[in-house]
Amino acid sequence: MRQSELIRAAYEGKNTLVIKNANVVNVFTDEIVRADVAVYEDVIIGVGSYSGENEIDAGGAYLAPGFIDAHVHIESSMVIPSSFMKVIMPHGTTTVIADPHEIANVAGAAGIRAMYKLTDELPLRVLFMLPSCVPATPFEHSGAKLVAEDMEQFMHKSRVLGLGEVMDANSVINCSQEMLDKLRLFDKRPIDGHAPMLEGMGLNAYRVAGAFSDHECSTYEEVKQKLATGMNILLRIGSAANNMDGVLRRIAKEKLPTRNMMFCTDDKHIEDIRREGHINANARMAVAAGIDPIDAIKMASYNAARAYGIRGVGAIAPGYKADMVLLEDLKDFKVKQVISRFGRPYTGEEQMPSPILPPQVFNSVRLPEISKYDLALRCHVSAPVIKMIPHQLVTELVYRDVERDENGCFIPSEGMVKLAVIERHHATGSMAVGILEGLGIKHGAVASTVAHDSHNLVVAGDNDEDMLMAIESLRDCGGGYSVVSRGVVLARLPLPIAGLMTAAPVNDVLEIQQALLDALYSLGAKRDSDPLIALSFMALPVIPAVKLTDEGLFDAVNFKFIKYN
């Protein structure tokens, strides 16, 4: 569209859509004004009194900028981007800032290209931060490795904003040349941080390196400390990490400024989105905690656009893009209608092109033969154990007196199961076995190729036979999730795209997901949290306190391996 055409349309009031009788949220003046909003093609040309051939009567509903998820891994939804869009857009999200490091860890640059192509023509605006840590650390094996040179091919792309979450803070602080090369490449662009519990001089060094945001704060004190360094704080409500209520209440109570705060989901399963909402759920929680509704709207939209330099997005004003959301109120944030980035009402019936994917993202489960001898874990009577913490990604390192057989090998008992991580990209045979507390299952096993961030195969169970069957079940289907009990596969979700995603219809995926959860609950898993997503983070060595990689039990606080014997 020519600039002169837009200027004339704005001057003459010529429009392609008018939203009438709306309570318009102005993020610049912190006001709510009863007005009409005129749109020409995909741009807002005015807020005032308008009429046109194509009108939507808001009937006094609140009109807000389309919501922005400031940090998300689309692959964690387990469905392709067009299916993901159909789940989140009805909840008012019109823009996501995606970090495709899940598929990049499996398929490298080919995976990034695939995600870029799959999102090119969607009504959902999908912007990208390029994965900075593939693999996340040098303490595990992933399917690919990305260095600064690999990223240069993407720098010119219009939807690439900056560098994705820098999880390996240790490499930053120690001035790893490989990490410095990436930071220099993105010196003039946003660089996302990922630094749980980092403080003091370490945090100072991390900020000096260029990290400008963090989505890993779990306490009010951490939020305030990082905010004071100039960081943007992304308040996350995901499926596994869902502990923001108390933090938001303190923010409201202490009247901490929210202008550098925004919302994200990071990793949220589609059934949770359908049940709870997406970014509108973050806004709902914020208002319930005492945050001013207009501030909550800004945290859900404008703040992220401003921080990431997304021009013309995040506000309802002349010259801004026309993606907007009509809300019944500013308490529950129930969505009445969504206007997409194309300046048209989103119906969910839009025809999407068939996904075309490169061969590199298929047949990604490559395993050697695994036997029960590979699953044996020799240990002392007092053994290190990974203790899961409900609703959090962090774990606790504890020592427990465990049962052992005549060979000194761990026998699952007393709420503790065996956990194994197996390299699944190149059939190297690299694998490690550990002990996990808190999963709660008995007489069975669960396996997954969704295992952040290297996405090796992770399997947990209280007996070797079911663990082996779960492993073979995923080898056969090209990756996904599998639950086994007493030699029977109770449920399996094939994820043939990089072992992470499927092109199957969302309802089919939800049905199988529920079958997986029901199977795990029947085996004793706790119903107050999602055991599938919790398990998928047990191999992520950049989140404290202890995790298991294919190389061994890793102390994520002191960055060293812990031996069992």
Model feature map: region roles:
Residues 1-35, 39-40, 48, 89-91, ...:
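Active-site microenvironment of metallo-dependent hydrolases
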Residues 145-164, 170-235, 242-263, 274-288, ...:
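Histidine/acidic residue-rich metal-binding segments in metalloenzymes
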Residues 73-77, 101-103, 131-136, 166-169, ...:
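Active-site beta-loop-alpha junctions enriched in small/polar residues
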